[in-house]
């Protein structure tokens, strides 16, 4: 499923929840109830390896970025004055940057680190990270029926956190613990 269809599925009643690294935002909180955050993730600003013009989010003004459609990254790029081109996948955003069709992309620090680990020869670099981490949680519909579901999700997250399983899974797949509010520290 394409990214922009995930939340639409909740809106239409097709899904009760969505679990796909979804950031909690003020706008989304108006439409959905969110679980307790299970991860904390900063936004990475990524450019081609030879780009020396963009060093900070402020440098995006007047530049072209490529971002996942309807993502928090697209909104953030627009807030910094970038011209935004929407695509469906992370691979597409990186390809746009590599081919020079876009100057930069914004995405999850964890997703970019994973991409770079799997493709160490990719000619990209992270030039900036947001200071604040985004809260990552599971959205549910705002209905009376979803209250018990949200309670069960929160209980499961609490149990996994207390047992150390959330941290263990994070270390296994991301090489760092993104389940704690202190993010960005690589595994030793």
For the regions a language model picked out, list residue spans one by one.
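Periplasmic-binding protein-like
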Residues: 40-47, 113-154, 176-188
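Beta->alpha turn/N-cap motifs
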Residues: 1-4, 13-25, 48, 68-72, ...
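Ligand-binding clefts/hinges and TM-proximal coupling segments of bilobed small-molecule sensing domains
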Residues: 75-85, 124-126, 157-188
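Short helix-initiation/N-cap motifs at beta->coil->alpha
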Residues: 1-8, 52, 70, 85-99, ...
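Short loop->beta-strand "edge-of-pocket" segments that line small-molecule binding or catalytic clefts
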Residues: 57-70
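Acidic, polar ligand-binding/catalytic clefts
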Residues: 1-59
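Ligand-binding cleft/hinge of the Venus flytrap
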Residues: 35, 70-90, 94, 116-120
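A ligand-binding cleft/hinge motif common to bilobed small-molecule-binding domains
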Residues: 21-30, 76-79, 103-133
């Amino acid at each position: 499923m394409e990214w922009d269809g995930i939340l639409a599925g909740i809106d239409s009643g097709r899904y009760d929840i969505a679990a796909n690294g979804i950031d909690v935002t003020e706008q989304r909180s108006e439409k959905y109830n969110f679980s307790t955050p299970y991860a904390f993730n900063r936004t990475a600003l990524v450019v081609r390896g030879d780009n020396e013009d963009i060093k900070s989010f402020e440098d995006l003004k007047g530049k072209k970025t490529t971002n996942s459609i309807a993502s928090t990254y697209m909104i953030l790029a627009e807030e910094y004055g970038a011209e935004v081109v929407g695509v469906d996948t992370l691979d597409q955003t990186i390809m746009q940057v590599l081919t020079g069709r876009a100057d930069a992309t914004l995405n999850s620090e964890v997703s970019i680190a994973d991409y770079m680990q799997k493709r160490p020869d990719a000619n990209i670099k992270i030039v900036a990270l947001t200071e604040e981490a985004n809260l990552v949680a599971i959205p549910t519909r705002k209905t009376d029926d979803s209250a018990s579901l949200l309670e069960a999700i929160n209980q499961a997250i609490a149990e996994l956190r207390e047992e150390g399983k959330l941290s263990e899974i994070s270390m296994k797949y991301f090489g760092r613990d993104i389940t704690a509010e202190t993010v960005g520290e690589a595994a030793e």
